[in-house]
Amino acid sequence: MNDKEYMRLALQLAKKGCGWTSPNPMVGDVVVKEGRIIGQGWHQRYGQAHAERNALASCTEDPQGATLYVTLEPCCHYGKQPPCVDAILDAGIHRVVVGSADPNPLVAGKGIAILRAHGIDVTENVLQEECDALNKVFFHYITTKRPFVSMKYAMTMDGKIATYTGASKWITGEIARNHVQRQRHRFRGIMVGVGTILADDPLLTCRIEGGRDPVRIICDTHLRTPLQSQVVMTAKQVPTILATCCGDPEKQAAYQQAGCRILCLEEHCGHVNLLQLMEQLGQEQIDSILLEGGGTLNWSALESGIVQQVQAYIAPKLFGGRDAKAPIEGAGVPLPDAAFRLKNSRLEQLGKDFLIESEVEYPCLPESWKKSEQ
C-alpha cells in the first residue's frame, strides 16, 4: 500500500465519528511500521480522546520508528484533551503524513512546524481534496464562528414541494427519506419556520436507531407555535429553541415551562434577524444546521447570506398547479444574471429519486454580513 491508500483508510475511519464529534472535526489515523498496519483510530466523541491518541493506544507493537497517517494536522494546544503532537513525539514516530492543514487559529501550521522542529519527516496534502471535504463544516465554523447551513428540500421535477392542496407526504421514496434521517444525525441543529409547524406539526428528530437528535430551532417571529405541537410537547426530551421577536414575558413563559428556550432577537424585514440568530447559535457551539424550511424562510436565508450548501432531493413526479408551493419563494431575483449560483455540484441516485448537492456561490459578501462586521 502507498501513502494515498493508507490515507483512504484513515478517511474511512474518520467518518465513523460523523454526528458525534461536533464542534470538533472528524479525524482518522493509521499507524504503519515496516509495511504493516499496527494501529488505527478515530475521534469518536466530542470531549473524548483525539484520533492520534486512540491510534497509538491501539498499536499491537511499539510504534517507535513508524509512520502515522492522519487526515487533519495534529493539534498543538490544550483544550478538552492534551496536544496530539506530544503523543506523537512521545511515541517515537519517525514520519507523519497529513491530509488537511487545520485552519483553527490555535493550530494553523503550528502542529506541523513542531513536528519538523523535532526532526520528524512530515508529508503534507495527501488526498487533500477528500480530507478538506470531510471537514467542510468544521472549516467553516472554526473560521467564521457561525454554523454551516445546508438548505434541504424535496421536490418534484416541476419544482413543487407540495400539491395545490398543501399535501406533501410523500414526495420522495423511502431510500431518500432514510438518507435525510442520516443528515439529521450528522447536523447539530435543524431549523424550520413556524409555517412548517402549523402546516405539518413535525417532530424534527432523527429516526435512525442510535442516532443523535439535532437541536430544533423554530423561527417564529410572533410566537405562534401551538403549545400542543409535537416540538413543544417534547421539548424536555429534545433541545428546542424558539427564535422570536416577541418580547411578551407571559407568552414566553408558557413555552419555557414546556421546556423550550427562547431567543429574543431583532426584527429584520418583518422576520427574525437570521444573521443575528446564526451568531447566537455559533456562540453556543452549534456548528451546523440542516435548514428544512418552506419557501419563505429559504428565501430569507439565502437573502441573508447564511446558506453554504443546497441539498435538493428530486422525485420523478409532476404535480403542476399554479398555487402549489415551491422550495424557494419570497421576492426572488429580478433578472437571471442576479441568480444565486451553485458550484461543485454532486449527483447521487437514491432509489428512484436523485440528490443534487451544491455549494452556494455568493457573488460578493452579502450586505447583511457587511453591516454585521461594522
Language-model regions: role of each:
Residues 28:
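Helix-turn-helix
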Residues 10-14, 23, 34-41, 130-143, ...:
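A short, flexible N-terminal coil/short beta segment enriched in small residues
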Residues 19-23, 112, 126-154:
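Proteins enriched for Cys/Gly/acidic motifs involved in redox and nucleic-acid/cofactor modification
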Residues 2-8, 13-17, 22-24, 63, ...:
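Enzymes that bind and transform nitrogen-containing heteroaromatic metabolites
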Residues 59, 116-117, 142-144, 309, ...:
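Short alpha-helix boundary/capping motifs
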Residues 105-106, 132, 298, 320:
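Generic structural signal for helix capping and beta-alpha/helix-loop junctions
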Residues 31-130, 215, 241, 246-248, ...:
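Zn2+-dependent cytidine deaminase-like catalytic core
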Residues 8, 12-15, 39, 50-53, ...:
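A broad detector of short, well-ordered amphipathic alpha-helices
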